[in-house]
């Protein structure tokens, strides 16, 4: 009889011990979960804050780059702020154009000719930017008219350039570096203008279309 009572007592103690142990384990697990969740939330917040800082930094750097671009344009001297590409036709200047005179005796490929024409056109534009800003603006605002003509020799290109200089017309003669198809120093394309049409025609009117 006494043995049964002892067994019952041990069973009751074991039961309560199990209940208490389970309770404390649950409490500890809950606390651990809360702590873990709190840490995860803090980590997420920290990541979001870092991402926000990176985004703000990138935006600031982007703004700085834009400022640098504006400054570069100003240094290049494209136009004054007051010019600001106003679309207003200047009757005194009239219609403007640029002629590209291509030398035909060199046997240049189409790709080579295109590249040389680009060099000539941009070179003449840079000269006009310095010496004929109003004419350049008129030309750029109203179509950037370009015509390709042909010459048969270096001497013809040089004569045309000299005539343009005499008349005060912007011109630019391209001398090739000789890295590809033709000898170094070869005169390839002459740009005449941008300038008023009459001034350009005074130099190139006798030439044939390319």
Curated annotation (Swiss-Prot):
EC number, as in UniProt: 3.1.1.29
Region (Disordered): 40-81
Any one GO cellular component localisation term in the record: cytosol
Compositional bias segments (type: Basic and acidic residues): 40-60
InterPro entries: Pep_tRNA_hydro_II_dom_sf, PTH2
Pfam family, one: PTH2
Bias (Acidic residues): 61-81
Catalytic activity entry: an N-acyl-L-alpha-aminoacyl-tRNA + H2O = an N-acyl-L-amino acid + a tRNA + H(+)
Keywords: Hydrolase
MF-aspect GO terms: peptidyl-tRNA hydrolase activity
Source taxon at top rank: Eukaryota
Reported function: The natural substrate for this enzyme may be peptidyl-tRNAs which drop off the ribosome during protein synthesis.
Record family assignment: Belongs to the PTH2 family.
Protein name: Probable peptidyl-tRNA hydrolase 2
